[in-house]
């Protein structure tokens, strides 16, 4: 059962590759290039997708449940 505190980013479901669990804390695992693809499918250019992702998602810390990004 996934903890309700696991953070799923809206619009990036296609980039989820799994879950991580450590001492009862669940973290969603995303594949970075699939995040770019999801953003480009929403109309962004590759450059804009990379910049937006890195600024708004990749470099953010939102607590113990901060998602993991696999390169």
Where are the regions that the model predicts?
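C-terminal alpha-helical interaction appendages
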Residues: 1-71
């Amino acid at each position: 059962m996934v903890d309700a505190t696991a953070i799923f980013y809206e619009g990036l479901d296609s980039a989820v590759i799994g879950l991580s669990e450590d001492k009862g804390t669940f973290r969603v695992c995303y594949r970075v290039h699939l995040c770019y693809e999801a953003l480009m499918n929403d109309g962004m250019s590759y450059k804009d997708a990379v910049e937006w992702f890195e600024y708004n998602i990749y470099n953010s810390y939102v607590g113990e449940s901060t998602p993991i990004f696999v390169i």
